[in-house]
């Protein structure tokens, strides 16, 4: 609590636009400030800077309420390319499931895809906050690469996703499964892996039958 208060407080050496920053921080809930404080290892100044960056980003078309009401995001969601599953994984984490064959880089609108991604992460985290103490704090992402071809390879979106992991949702995604990536995915992964840095360790490439181990025994997710 003290760290959150320090983040909200104005500093004597603050620049002239500090009042704008203070107004932004005043609009942020305590849980958000506390999360960035933990991410920055209790360094209030670094956490404050990262939180302000996050809040400014939210103002650029990624506001939670704005995404919920967006007809464009709803149209993108209707494609079924990415969904928040109704079931959790074996660790009770929410799961965002992406079917790559439903995503064509030639016809997609990047902004819509990015905004759908954020909306699904928001929905997962909102679920967890509603469950109170003892609930998981992270989610899993599953990318189903069965049938993947190069027309499904979207490096620009991947760069956005990685930026989200680092800057906007740090330590919120604790597992990424790549389901049966074909050989044509290899050069894509060679580009993506270095961009992920330490987060590359979260990624596991698995067969569909082995992915079942990450879910409850009764799950039928990978039976098809």
Show which residues each predicted segment covers.
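Basic, amphipathic alpha-helical/coil surface patches used to engage anionic, phosphate-bearing ligands
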Residues: 1-224
């Amino acid at each position: 609590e003290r760290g959150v208060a320090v983040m909200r407080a104005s500093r004597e050496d603050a620049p002239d636009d500090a009042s704008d920053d203070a107004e932004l921080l005043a609009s942020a809930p305590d849980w958000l400030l506390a999360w960035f404080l933990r991410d920055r290892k209790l360094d209030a100044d670094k956490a404050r800077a990262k939180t302000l960056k996050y809040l400014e980003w939210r103002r650029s078309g990624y506001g939670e309420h704005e995404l919920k009401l967006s007809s464009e995001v709803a149209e993108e969601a209707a494609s079924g390319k990415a969904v928040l599953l109704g079931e959790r994984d074996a660790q009770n984490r929410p799961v965002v499931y992406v079917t790559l064959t439903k995503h064509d880089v030639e016809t997609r609108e990047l902004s819509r895809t990015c905004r759908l991604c954020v909306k699904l992460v928001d929905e997962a985290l909102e679920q967890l906050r509603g469950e109170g103490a003892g609930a998981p704090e992270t989610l899993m992402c599953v990318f189903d690469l069965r049938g993947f071809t190069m027309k499904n390879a979207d490096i620009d979106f991947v760069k956005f996703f990685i930026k989200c992991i680092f800057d906007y949702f740090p330590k919120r995604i604790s597992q990424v499964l790549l389901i049966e990536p074909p050989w044509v995915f290899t050069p894509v992964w060679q580009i993506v892996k270095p961009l992920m840095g330490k987060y590359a360790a979260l990624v596991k490439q698995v067969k569909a039958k082995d992915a079942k181990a990450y879910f409850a025994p009764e799950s039928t997710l990978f039976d098809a």
